[in-house]
Amino acid sequence: MQAQFQLLCFLVMIPMLFSVPWLAANRFSPQQVARNLAVAGLGIAAASVAWLLGGYSLAFHQEVISDPLPVLVQLEFALYALVMLLGTALAARRTLFFPLFAALWLLLVYVPVANLLWGNGWLAKLGALDFSGGLVVHLTAGLTSLVLVRHLRVQLPILTAEQPGTTALGTVLIFTGWFGFNLAPAGSFLPHGPLIMLNTVVAVLTAGLAWAVAAPGQELVDRLCNGINTGLVTSTALVGFVGPQTMAVTGLVAGLIAAQLVERYHQVWQDPVDSLQINTTGALVGVGGLILGFDPHLVPAGTTHLALAGSELTAVGVVVLITLVGSQVALWLSEGCLHAYQRIRGVNINVRSEEN
């Protein structure tokens, strides 16, 4: 039964995983859509190869061949972190940049963080909790978007207006897939599956309503879709550890804060999916909700608010450090490899020209 449950979660997440690149690619000019989708596909392929050849084993200390299904489920978590920062990476306008960066980022940032929190690493032993990726997936993605935006700021294009139908459809696919995203770490539907589903819906409703009220400068469809995405992101850190009342308050707070940040900084960052504001806000507010409102029956025995606050804040600090340093190193290495490739290619072209 556990294998069938994991398979169902894996299949449900597939449309969600590919809807984010679709939304990001369509925010650029129509002439760039095909290229952007191709770049996204290359990046997903490169990161998947890195995960299968060593990333999973390093993160979870298990061989890929021993039990392939968890490898694929965890791969989707890693890839979702990557596609959320895709919109920023597309601004580099170099086809080989994102595939190189994706593979390096997965090994230098995602794998160490996943090991520390989900692979029985030091932060997990310290008592830090992260149910379905508030820190592992969303905080790493949001902070990496910050690194990329700062590096690529002068190259960022003017984004095209969002199409309400495209945005709504993409959001529906993400919402549907998120049930698999939040349920997969539970391992089975019972006993906590119904609560996880309820908390996911509550987070979406409260964050969506908060966005609708707090961001009057945006179209209503955009506000609701952004609110849904914020609620989904916020739910991940605590969805299996709290009751619906705590989730409602957490979703409301996250929606209000994220709406203000996007309203104020969207034109500054020019990120098609507002990864920095939504992911970082959702992750940090989710951690705060977990510390203040966890249900003692849903967390490890003996957990106290003070102890959890210490372990969670330590985890946040460690994840921030690993992400900022690892992302910058991955960026430098990607740029260096591209520069070397261009020089070698230029030499080869000159040699062929002389021979002709």
Which role does the model predict for each range below?
Residues M1-N356:
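Glycine- and aromatic-enriched membrane alpha-helices
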